[in-house]
Amino acid sequence: KRFEAFLHHDRSFNGRIVFPIRDITGKVVAFNGRHMTMTERPKYLIYPPQAVMPLFPSNVKSVKGKIILVEGIFDMINLHDKGLTNAVCCFGTSNIDADKLAILKMQNIDGVDIVFDGDEAGQSAAENVKVLAEKVGLVSRNVNLGANIDPGALAEVKVHSLRERLYSS
């Protein structure tokens, strides 16, 4: 059966790359469209507008141990592309709560490395997520990349350095 988004054309999605967002069961629950220019607003559109966005990808059963939690889908794609395939995005710092983190725990995830943007807002949100994660029994740490550094903009050499920082003990 077709998802209702395919039954009409919405001009507000022109010029956007659109990602189907699935819940833990694999059902498409929303579409996230990101404009490809930095001048268009809003940068992201979600359809349907009232959709509750899960963590993405929501099914992390293939991940062993820890995930890397990032803010945006392009942050996640960049890390996956460069070999950190345990990256999961939360679709913005205001879209994370204890229930979403508890779903990770139910999938045998035991830790979260929080790699949010290096700006003040990102780091403040990372500290809040750390508290939430620990409340649901996830070992967590805030991994600060530095002032105004975005995980989606990291070059391969920087992702390699991040990998070493996260996994060399």
What are these regions (language model features)?
Residues 69, 109-121, 143-144:
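Acidic beta-strand-to-loop metal/phosphate-binding motif
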Residues 122-125, 150-153:
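Switch/connector loops and helix/strand junctions flanking conserved nucleotide-binding motifs
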Residues 91-96, 117-118, 146:
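Short, acidic/turn-prone active-site loops that include or flank metal/cofactor-
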Residues 142, 147-148, 154-169:
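C-terminal or mid-to-C-terminal helical accessory/interaction module adjacent to the motor/catalytic core
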Residues 135-139:
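Short acidic, glycine/proline-enriched helix-loop-strand junctions
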Residues 129:
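Conserved phosphate-handling catalytic cores of large alpha/beta enzymes
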